[in-house]
Amino acid sequence: GKTESFLLPIINHLLREQEAGTLSAGVRAIIIYPMNALANDQMKRMRALFKNYPQICYGVYNGNTEHTQSKALAEYHRTYHDETGEPTDPAPNEIISREVMQERPPHILITNYSMLEYMMLRPKDDAVFSGAKLKFIVLDEAHIYKGATGMETSLLMRRLRARISEPDSVQYILTSATLGGPDADGDILSFAEKLCGVAFQRSGIIRSTEKRPAMEDFLDFAPALFEELQSCLLYTSDAA
């Protein structure tokens, strides 16, 4: 459920833009995964979700993303097949090559912190940032960003804020399966603020809660109930 916890607000924002007639090209959300394997795994769920929202464009930009559309399409055909084994085409709203992403940046950009740093250095990728109308930055598995990796990512977040227009309108979302209990709230806020370079509120810490459906406990069954159940099973067996 972590993926849906940040994807649904992003989709909601984009749909509201569409209703208002302001949904133009430009990156609205950057989702940063620590590893390509995680991004590729989540892309399966995103493809299933975004097929219902063809107006929302999305794409993965990492070291495996091909430069040209022709190479990207050939690689897609080698990787993805339908039930009959035939190659499948990407959805019209999935951008699969660097050249198209540079010409027409997606609304939702999926990447990793290393590639994001390279993109900020390359003139070819300037359109991704100069035309961005960024509203969300998501750091998935945020607990990974500690030590040297955390310091590099923290600096990257500050450089990104300096690069985009209206940085104060960006909402940061950090996800982790190892948050800790309420007694760790202070450490969580301190970690998030140091990593992203912005202030966080305690009310912004959201933990998952397990809710089980209320069911009656049948600890003692009267013998008559077992006899009735047995007769039903015998009747069903005879009828078959």
Role assignments for model-derived ranges:
Residues 4-21:
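Walker A/P-loop NTP-binding motif
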Residues 27-48:
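Conserved Walker A/P-loop ATP-binding site and its immediately adjacent core
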Residues 61-68:
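Conserved helicase motor
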Residues 90-107, 114-132:
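Conserved helix/coil segment N-terminal to the catalytic DExD/H
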Residues 105-108, 134-135, 169-173:
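Loop/turn-to-beta-strand initiation segments
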Residues 128-157:
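SF2 helicase catalytic motif II
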Residues 147-205:
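Post-DEXD/H (motif II) to motif III coupling segment of the RecA-like Helicase ATP-binding lobe
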Residues 235-240:
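Conserved small/polar residues in nucleotide/adenosyl-binding loops
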